[in-house]
Amino acid sequence: MLNLRTAIALCICLVLAACASSPKSTMRSARPPILSAEQSRDAAIHAMGLVGTPYRYGGNTVDGGFDCSGLIAYVYRESAGLSTPRTVAQLAGFGDAIPRDELRTGDLVVFGGGRPTHAGIYVGENRFVHAPSTGGEVRLDRLDGPYWSRQKLDVRRP
């Protein structure tokens, strides 16, 4: 009798376990592709060519001007055919997180930590290109400069 109860309990457990499991997903990850080193360099060169372009809130074209995320979207689309998110908050989760000591040309630099506020494109030698503020222009700045060195920095590699 005890064996019959054990067998019934085991069958019930197996049925419940089968009902509780979900089929393996066939969807691929939404993670963007990793750019090659050459594509990353091309993005950095393209970004440097836009230095001096006027800042414009919400802007994402050479003629209309750029804000920081519009600059990033334009550069990666034109130089590598890559679509990027259009807000700094979304850029903070885009691509792979990279330790700062592994920063390479073409990586995204995102400032603000838990609440991202600004982003740019790293171009090497501790410099990055960004569209900083209303009334300004796309410019080249240093990560170790007096202002930017005090900001929380995350690095993302698309």
Regions found by a protein language model. Name each.
Residues M1-C19:
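Sec-dependent bacterial lipoprotein signal peptides
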Residues P33, T53-T105, L153:
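Catalytic cysteine-centered active-site loop
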Residues W148-P158:
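Glycine- and charge-enriched low-complexity intrinsically disordered segments
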